[in-house]
């Protein structure tokens, strides 16, 4: 935050920075979404500058339909592979321990599940040994060193940051994508402030992951709150026929400790995940049908966590009620 302000003239709220950093602990795909002009792309750009490895920008086009837009394709006529900047960056990343941030700029100007579906599936594999993507159908003696049997291992030091505008020119992002990503809403412009001159830092991805994993040990989500989350899950299943799911619970266990490690509170971290990962699913329901149930849900949240807490979730639910 101080680096972005002092070096780049970019202003971000401290909570937004906490959410952004914590998201790296929970998923490989971060979605920065909101209205145009709020600094979504600039935030991802500033992160690359801060860690001394400029972000790679892949400008998504409306014509993107499949994986070849990301990786390129083998031209059978010329017998040459037409590579993309992203593929070059992936190959380069396999040779060092820098942190790589790939910006999928305006990611929903095309259907995300068309061109990124394979990556979503691969990055969910529990073992990083399974993080491999097919590049060419056959292997050749002249293949680059890290292309083995036509496959390239997806580098563990790379994260993907999509920016998404919510307007009529874009496609809605599906639940399949949202479930596997961490969405962060940026709906307001940053307020200027004074900051001391702050330099960039070099941090290897291994040290970055060590810090994130250390937070999971030091700031593990309390059993009391996990029990409350389980009770809330049962309530939502009974009244709304929607379940949290194991994936979201795992992300919650990964995200919240990192959020606390950046200076946030456990309840605020839980509140954010519930609002953006669980209650967001209500938008796909018949809002007129669930309208009367929302007040009961808000009351149950107050009963579990206290009236003064979970404000983002309750505000989001009340906003949905007003849409009816």
Segments predicted by a language model, with ranges:
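AAA+ P-loop NTPase catalytic core and its hallmark functional loops
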Residues: 1-211
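Alpha-helical lid/collar subdomain of P-loop NTPases
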Residues: 156, 196-324
